């Protein structure tokens, strides 16, 4: 086990500049997609408490409830967290100037991904 000196996404999201926020969003999508490909269901993507943000890297933590599964929901859970209706998503939309058309596109993509 390793100590990571970082801040939870739910509190860090308000402090990140535009470039760092965009990189964090990209990192979270890559991490969750990789978990899906590996067949690992994290089970605690929502809420932003299980992503730690440092100056250079984004981590996902707390795999104690994770399970191997054929069908996983990490990536779609991340889409909901980052582009849904919650406070984190609202902050991301505002800081990255993401419009309603882009949000609709992302959500439609997530629906299609879910059917794969």
Curated annotation (Swiss-Prot):
<protein>
    <recommendedName>
        <fullName>Uncharacterized protein MJ1211</fullName>
    </recommendedName>
</protein>
């Amino acid at each position: 086990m390793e100590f990571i000196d970082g801040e939870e996404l739910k509190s860090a999201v308000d402090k990140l500049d535009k470039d760092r926020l965009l990189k964090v969003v990209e990192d979270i999508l890559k991490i969750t997609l990789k978990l899906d490909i590996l067949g690992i269901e994290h089970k605690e993507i929502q809420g932003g408490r299980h992503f730690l943000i440092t100056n250079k890297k984004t981590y996902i933590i707390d795999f104690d409830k994770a399970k191997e599964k054929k069908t996983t929901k990490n990536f779609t859970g991340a889409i909901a967290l980052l582009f849904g209706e919650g406070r984190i998503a609202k902050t991301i939309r505002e800081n990255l100037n993401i419009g309603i058309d882009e949000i609709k596109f992302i959500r439609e993509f997530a629906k299609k991904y879910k059917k794969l």
